[in-house]
A protein has these predicted regions:
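Cytosolic-side transmembrane-helix boundaries in multi-pass membrane proteins
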Residues: 1-22, 293-342
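N-terminal signal-anchor module of multipass membrane proteins
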Residues: 1-61, 337-342
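C-terminal ends of transmembrane helices
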Residues: 7, 55-67, 103-114, 196-205, ...
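Alpha-helical transmembrane segments in multi-pass membrane proteins
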Residues: 22-29, 45-57, 74-79, 83, ...
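Structural signature of hydrophobic alpha-helical transmembrane segments
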Residues: 39-51, 89-97, 177, 181-191, ...
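Membrane-interface helix-loop-helix junctions at boundaries between adjacent transmembrane segments
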Residues: 71-151
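Long hydrophobic alpha-helical segments that form multi-pass transmembrane helix bundles
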Residues: 115-195
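Loop-to-transmembrane alpha-helix initiation sites
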Residues: 117-121, 250-258, 279, 297-310
């Protein structure tokens, strides 16, 4: 492996390595909630994912003839994020294939640490979603007894997104939605725990809130203006219609792994835009694309596909912002020079 690239990756690891370590640590409270809702199988799945991520890292080190870096937790964090986006009944081979695709195709093919243009966790999830949709988008109800090894016989429920897509209403309280007491991915249901994780990352200065907030605000505005249940309020007053629209916003933002993606996917250091205006535009575009996928697509977790689409231009957003600032600065200098000359 090229020595210059190795040195560059080691320098990048010094700057962003703690982010991936914190992501791994923050998966623990989500895992506790998942085990409370679904038993011990989520613990085995996440342990398997952690092992797979580490083995992929060691395999790549061997193939590239470089020393294994024990302080690099990026592959493990991607593997855990993929696992927590899966249902508790997912088969082992589906999870393994998603992790291998995320680490090898999403990360290592592009050069490894810090060189990939697409979020590896989103890549792995997208591969599994397209290849095995019946495994990825069917979730067991909470408090279901799930066997540890073979969960093929467990009854799975239709997703909340199916109800929303058909124009129906969710018959769940706001507290149940916030606690994750509905059929959802293992780690993406409990909004309260996810918000706490996001605040921790922000306090630790691992993430910026601009991308996540612009993402959620954009999605919320689209839902408020164009709810999928609009026909239910045709003859209602303005106040009733506004309250109904706010309920639709709540239902859309608390389901479909929206909060999870805002915390664990959107702010990945090497796929998110780096400048403030770029991050805001990045979040707006991901939010708009996500609602487009949710309204007109066939997959529940459209945010991963939207994220991959916007990842392709995140670098362009940064470069455009830099060029814009340079243009404004040069224009201001010219105007100042003219003023001084007069």
């Amino acid at each position: 492996m090229d020595e210059a690239l190795i040195r560059k990756q080691e320098e990048e690891l010094q700057h962003t390595g703690r982010y991936y370590k914190h992501i791994c640590f923050l998966c623990v409270p989500l895992l506790f909630v998942s085990c409370y809702l679904y038993g011990l199988r989520p613990l085995l799945l996440c342990g398997f994912a952690l092992l797979m991520g580490n083995l992929c890292d060691r395999l790549i080190s061997l193939l590239r003839r470089r020393v294994y870096r024990p302080g690099d937790y990026s592959n493990e964090s991607f593997a855990l994020v993929i696992a927590l986006l899966m249902p508790a009944t997912v088969d082992w081979y589906v999870l393994a294939a998603a992790i291998v695709a995320g680490v090898l195709i999403g990360k290592e093919v592009f050069g490894g640490y810090g060189s990939y243009p697409f979020n590896p966790a989103a890549v792995g999830y997208a591969v599994a979603a397209v290849s095995w949709p019946e495994q990825v988008f069917r979730y067991p109800p909470p408090y279901t007894s799930i066997p540890l090894w073979d969960a093929s016989g467990v009854a799975t429920a239709s997703t909340i997104s199916d109800t929303l897509r058909s124009g129906g209403l969710i018959n769940l309280s706001g507290l149940s939605l916030a606690l994750g007491e509905y059929a959802a991915p293992m780690g993406a249901g409990s909004a309260l725990v996810l918000v706490a994780c996001g605040l921790f990352l922000w306090v630790q200065k691992d993430i910026k809130l601009s991308a996540a907030l612009s993402f959620l605000v954009t999605a919320g505005v689209i839902v408020f203006l164009f709810p999928r249940q609009l026909g239910l309020t045709e003859d209602a007053s303005f106040a009733v219609s506004a309250m109904f629209r706010l309920r639709c916003v709540r239902d859309e933002l608390l389901t479909g792994a929206m909060i999870f993606s805002a915390v664990f996917l959107l702010n990945e250091p090497y796929t998110c835009a780096h400048h403030r205006l770029g991050r805001i535009l990045y979040g707006i575009m991901v939010g708009a694309f996500t609602m487009g996928f949710r309204y007109f697509g066939v997959y529940e977790t459209g945010v991963c596909f939207a994220l991959l689409a916007v990842n392709s231009i995140s670098g362009w957003l940064d470069r455009t912002e830099v060029h814009l600032y340079e243009l404004l600065h040069s224009s201001w200098k010219k105007q100042t020079g003219k003023g001084d000359a007069v």
